[in-house]
């Protein structure tokens, strides 16, 4: 799985995911499923905001790569990935400026057009169950929830999908491609099932003579995703390195 992640995700995303895991005492070489999940979630958050701007009339427009966007405002503020203190500073500033209610938990994005925070979810499980879990945790009408699955399904608050169909299809296609590439390498089953992942991990470590002292239970603790995002990702050109640059997964 580690090789897959390094081959199939933008190197900058991989580096940031590694920093986050190491800060919380997790090893990307061992917690490889979590490594893949963090990279996937971050990529979806950036894809969600990519190309979307607000013009001088307050209208949401899509600007393709190469077109001038110097005088336009990004439609979405990326909160996910910032340092936690800075993230809350941004959230507080948005709330003070717009008058929207402050969320209980840090959301992933803020939509300047709809004036609402957005929580992005990417699930390997049944999408309705995952959505309900998110909604039960957040318990706020101020935060809009949008869930994507690896099978092309999506679910959003009040069936309001925020983005145009083409932008959402781009995200779904990327997720489906990740799933297909994992499956072709025999990685998908372990990515979906913690028990299968545990079995595969023990098998891999045993073959390397590293199984001694391994915990007997899978950790279900979720790391805060990408809180060490570099400031350079938050300026006006933060998406430049990602636009139309998703690496093609290489066969081993």
From Swiss-Prot:
Site, Important for efficient shutoff activity: residue positions: 202-203
GO molecular function: RNA binding
Keywords: Decay of host mRNAs by virus, Eukaryotic host gene expression shutoff by virus, Host cytoplasm, Host gene expression shutoff by virus, Host mRNA suppression by virus, Host nucleus, Host-virus interaction
Site annotation Important for efficient shutoff activity and nuclear localization: residues: 195, 198-199
Protein localization: Host cytoplasm; Host nucleus
Main localization of the protein described in the UniProt heading: host cell
Transmembrane segments annotated in the record for this chain: none
Family label: Belongs to the influenza viruses PA-X family.
Name of the protein in its database record: Protein PA-X
The organism of origin for this protein: Influenza A virus (strain A/Swine/Wisconsin/1/1967 H1N1)
Gene name for this UniProt entry: PA
